[in-house]
UniProtKB/Swiss-Prot annotation:
Keyword Ligase: no
Keyword Aminoacyl-tRNA synthetase: no
Protein name as catalogued: UPF0756 membrane protein YeaL
Any GO CC annotation of this UniProt entry: plasma membrane
Recorded family membership: Belongs to the UPF0756 family.
Keywords: Cell membrane, Membrane, Transmembrane, Transmembrane helix
Membrane topology: Multi-pass membrane protein
One protein family per Pfam: DUF441
Organism annotation: Escherichia coli O139:H28 (strain E24377A / ETEC)
Length: 148
């Protein structure tokens, strides 16, 4: 039996490797392994909880320098005194807001996920871009097409 979905996933994984987007490639390969093994019974759970777990892991990674002491409290305090740091804080707020819109959009219009993924891979491959989070990209899309 020919599995079109598996072929699409393999193609996207290949694009991920070609564009040096190992995060995308490895993520897709993990999903392929889940798909072709008895682990496929976990797909409903992955679909329901995967995004939340991913955001938790991402937040842990972002907060680790504060928790480990690599980013000392004095640096955090000084960030409120420097205009460049204030700009960085404002941009961080905007990007977080966009990410929230992206979560909403991806939940209400999951068909856009493939387009976001292909667009990211093409941007990396053709324009020497850097793979950015699909949540932020989805947030930008939501500004154009709306949340629903």
């Amino acid at each position: 039996m020919f599995d079109v979905t598996l072929l699409i996933l393999l193609g996207l994984a290949a694009l991920g490797f070609i564009s040096h987007n190992t995060t995308v490639a490895v993520s897709i390969l993990v999903l392929i392994i889940v798909r072709v093994t008895p682990l496929s019974t976990f797909f409903p759970w992955i679909e329901k909880q995967g995004l939340s777990i991913g955001i938790i892991i991402l937040t842990i990674g972002v907060m680790a320098p504060i928790a480990s002491g690599t980013l000392p409290p004095s640096t955090l305090i000084h960030s409120f005194l420097n205009w460049k740091s204030l700009v960085a804080i404002a941009v961080g707020v905007i990007v977080s807001w966009l990410g929230g819109r992206g979560v909403t959009l991806m939940g209400s219009q999951p068909q856009l996920v493939a387009g976001l993924l292909v667009g990211t891979v093409l941007g990396v491959a053709l324009f020497r871009g850097v793979p950015v989070g699909p949540l932020i990209a989805a947030g930008l899309v939501s500004l154009i097409v709306g949340k629903q």
